[in-house]
């Protein structure tokens, strides 16, 4: 797995917003990859009205919602982010893109996200008859992605995220509906959770991955669960992202990823490169002292994860 990057992603001008070009500028010396224009695939997930609204907002340099900035360069960056994620899905690579995507709904932008990059790529794969395990370890629920796939069993959405936190849902009882019931898995971890809880949640998710037997694993790779990130109260270190990569490599030959959150520009490159090292079977590049969670946090987590497993036992086995 290698990084797919293009300087067009820096043209999404958000000023002093936490999601700003410095996030990718922190990755020094990256070669530019030719990435396709994602416009032909937007309609796999998004309404025509939404696509036109994003285009108009970018041209007018206005916000799409209170948290989501648009600038004249944002539309081109956003459609290329979609294209880069499609390319990553074809080559088993990591799309290092912005704007991110997992909060975007079919009909609206949300939470720094214009179009839902990973959902579009996953829907394209599903349309080709593939089963997709969509693993979202960003510290926020990918509520747009969850909504998009809540009524299908062809894409299993699994999220580990801080709760309570934005967007305010992603609780243990949100397991999908209709044909998709049992194919949405939320593992909401408490604030102050450390590496121990985070990796326990990962192992719980991987039990379902093994049973689902997907053709492809799609990863919403957000790194805002890190101890020193700006927007959450989780205490995960760089080593956990290496472990996730390693565990996924052992379970699937077909994995691609796209960047979601991660707002500390000093640690984001380390987290991403650790994840890549794990996926590629290389040695860990960066290692911090692992964090452990206080007993009260563990007790709250255990109540939650037991509820997660209880709600999904009709579909999946847990050890």
Task: Tell me the role of every PLM-derived stretch.
Residues 1-319:
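HDAC/HDAC-like amidohydrolase catalytic core signature
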């Amino acid at each position: 797995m290698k990084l797919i990057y293009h300087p067009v992603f820096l043209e999404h001008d958000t000023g002093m917003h936490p999601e700003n070009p410095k996030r990718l500028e922190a990755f020094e010396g990256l070669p530019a990859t030719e990435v396709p224009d994602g416009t032909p695939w937007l309609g796999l997930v998004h309404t025509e009205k939404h696509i036109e609204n994003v285009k108009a907002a970018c041209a007018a340099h206005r916000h799409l919602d209170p948290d989501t900035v648009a600038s004249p360069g944002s539309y081109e960056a956003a459609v290329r982010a979609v294209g880069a994620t499609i390319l990553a899905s074809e080559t088993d690579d990591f799309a290092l893109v912005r704007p991110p995507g997992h909060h975007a709904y079919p009909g609206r932008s949300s939470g720094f996200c214009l179009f839902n990059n990973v959902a579009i790529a996953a829907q394209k794969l599903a349309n080709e008859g593939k089963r997709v395990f969509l693993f979202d370890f960003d510290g926020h629920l990918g509520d747009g992605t969850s909504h998009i796939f809540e009524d299908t069993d062809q894409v299993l959405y699994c999220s580990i995220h801080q709760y309570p936190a934005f967007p305010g849902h992603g609780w243990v009882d949100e397991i999908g509906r209709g044909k998709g019931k049992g194919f949405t898995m939320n593992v909401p971890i408490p604030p102050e959770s450390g590496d121990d809880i985070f990796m326990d949640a990962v192992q719980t998710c991987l039990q379902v991955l093994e049973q689902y037997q997907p053709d492809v694993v799609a990863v919403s790779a957000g790194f805002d669960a890190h101890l020193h990130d700006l927007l959450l109260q989780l205490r995960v270190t760089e080593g956990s992202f290496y472990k996730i990569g390693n565990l996924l490599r052992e379970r699937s030959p077909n994995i691609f990823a796209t960047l979601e959150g991660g707002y500390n520009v000093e640690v984001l490159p380390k987290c991403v490169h650790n994840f890549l090292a794990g996926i590629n079977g290389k040695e860990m590049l960066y290692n911090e002292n692992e964090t452990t969670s206080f007993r009260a946090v563990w007790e709250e987590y255990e109540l939650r994860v037991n509820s997660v497993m209880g709600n999904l036992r009709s579909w999946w086995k847990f050890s």
